[in-house]
Amino acid sequence: MTFANALFPQPEAWRASRDETPAGGLTPMGVHALDAMIDLCGPIDHVYCQSFRRVVEIDSDDTTSILLRMKEGMSGYLGTITATGPGFSLQVFGSAGSVRLEGMTHVAGAPSEERRTRLFGTCKFQPVKGQAEVWEAEPYDVTRAALEAFAAAASGGPAYPIPVEEMIHGAALTEAIVRSAGSGAVEHVP
């Protein structure tokens, strides 16, 4: 999974502070990609992260690479780059083929009734044998859906769609990644 987002924040912005955004693009945006990986692949038990500043002039890393080892034996990679143009892709490989999702778009600044977020624009399934299937995802306001689900759960309605255990694991995973970025070592995720 890769995530690029030209944040280039002003020096006084919270995203420009290493204390507020450890491991570069991980904390402002990459955590959402980690949530998707946890949802698809289950808990992650070990991580290795390298994170450094190559281009930006603020006190924050712009290039972060994370290797993940899932409890079920799978492996994963998350890269975040905050010094390039925006982009997002997720690719999952299996014995029958692979699926690639890419092209997250967000119409920022549009009135709420016009704003639409497309989590993934193009979806492509490539079987090991046979022709690829490609389709476009429908626009969907992800932020609005998340806030509505939270409000419903807080009001005694249906439970929030992300299990609490996954949320706690995501926080522990983020902490382990930040530790690895600082230590330069593989870190266990409790």
Walk through the language-model features, giving the residues of each.
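A short, glycine/Asx- and small/polar-enriched loop/turn
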Residues: D59-T63
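Predominantly a Rossmann-like dinucleotide-binding segment in NAD(P)-dependent oxidoreductases
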Residues: M1-Q50, R54-E57, G184
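Active-site beta-strand termini and strand-to-loop segments that position acidic
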Residues: I66-G73, V92-G94
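C-terminal glycine/acidic-rich active-site capping loop/insertion
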Residues: F93-E165, E187-P190
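Glycine-rich phosphate/pyrophosphate-binding beta-alpha loops
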Residues: V31, G79-F88
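C-terminal hydrophobic helical "lid"/dimerization subdomain
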Residues: M167-G182
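A general structural signal for well-ordered alpha-helical segments in protein cores
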Residues: P11, A33-L34, T143-E148, T174-E175
